[in-house]
Design a protein with these regions (language model features):
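Acidic, polar ligand-binding/catalytic clefts
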Residues: 42, 51-115
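Ligand-binding clefts/hinges and TM-proximal coupling segments of bilobed small-molecule sensing domains
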Residues: 1, 128-145, 191, 221-254
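Periplasmic-binding protein-like
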Residues: 95-102, 183-217, 221, 238-254
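Bilobed "Venus flytrap"/periplasmic-binding protein-like clamshell domains
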Residues: 21, 33-46, 78, 97-155, ...
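Extracytoplasmic small-molecule ligand-binding "clamshell" domains
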Residues: 1-74, 226
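A ligand-binding cleft/hinge motif common to bilobed small-molecule-binding domains
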Residues: 78-85, 134-136, 164-197
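Extended ligand-binding regions for polar small-molecule ligands
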Residues: 38-39, 46, 106, 114, ...
């Protein structure tokens, strides 16, 4: 099902927002990329008989890089959203929800988006969480409340660092990431609540490359059906919060 050019080349160039644990992050050597997305890429490569070559790319640069032809696809826990579907085609492969991460001794414990009014909020740029925070800032002002100070960072690690260093009252991250961060931080953080019903996560490809999208959709579904997908997500603590039963194309909820 792969395009002939991909078969001939023997590889696909994959943009991935490293670090974004547990989806992708560096091992202790600072070079090897670990996580659920690299494992999925490896499994897809073995299934298709080609290499998936991951390249670290900031989230904000993934879609522009795809559109320019610099990368063949993105694999980075990216939300499939209607507005993004105007620029790329998504192959849906997971789901996720937003959550609030606070320090264990936090004074504020937001449970819903209106609870962030007046707080210092750390988010990663170009993410659904960043959009949610800035959108809520407008609503806070409209309701006569103090808007949150939204602090945007290039990486999720930097947003969490702002929380750890008390520059932020709360960090807004995905539920899968929040759960992983808590296991690694050993009591430093708490997740107060998931604040959204969740979104579909997709593998973006160029709009004009539907043949590749169809091949990836079939590949993801094969991994789901043969149990490889469940093993990978379970390994990274994502099975309960992030798994789906059926892949698809452009399945954005909003």
């Amino acid at each position: 099902m792969l395009p002939d050019a991909v078969k001939k080349a023997g590889y696909l160039t994959v943009a991935s927002d490293v670090p974004y644990p547990p989806f992708e992050f560096y091992d202790t050597d600072g070079k090897t990329i670990l996580g659920s997305d690299p494992d999925i890429a490896k499994a897809l490569g073995e299934l298709m008989g080609i290499q998936f070559r991951l390249q670290p790319v900031a989230q904000v640069n993934i879609i522009p890089g795809l559109s320019s032809g610099k990368y063949d696809l993105g694999l980075s826990g990216m939300a499939d959203r209607k507005e993004r579907e105007a620029a790329v085609t998504f192959v849906d492969y997971m789901r996720n929800a937003g959550t609030f991460l606070v320090t264990a001794d936090a004074k504020h414990h937001p449970m819903t988006l209106p609870d962030i009014c007046g707080l210092n909020v750390a988010v990663q740029s170009a993410t659904t969480m960043a959009d949610d925070a800035t959108g809520q800032a407008t609503k806070c002002t409209a309701d006569g409340k103090q808007a949150p100070k939204v602090m945007e960072f290039q990486s999720q690690d930097d947003a969490v660092l702002a929380l750890r260093s008390n520059r932020a009252d709360v960090a807004m991250v995905t539920a899968g990431s929040g759960a992983f961060i808590m296991t690694q931080a050993k009591g430093q953080f708490d997740m107060t609540a998931t604040y959204s019903a969740g979104s579909i996560l997709g593998i973006p490809v160029r709009k004009d490359n539907m043949q590749l999208a169809k091949a990836l959709e079939a590949g993801v579904q094969k991994l789901i059906d043969n149990g490889t997908y469940k093993k990978i997500l379970t390994k990274w603590g994502l099975d309960k919060l992030n798994s789906i039963e059926k892949s698809g194309i452009n399945g954005a909820i909003s």
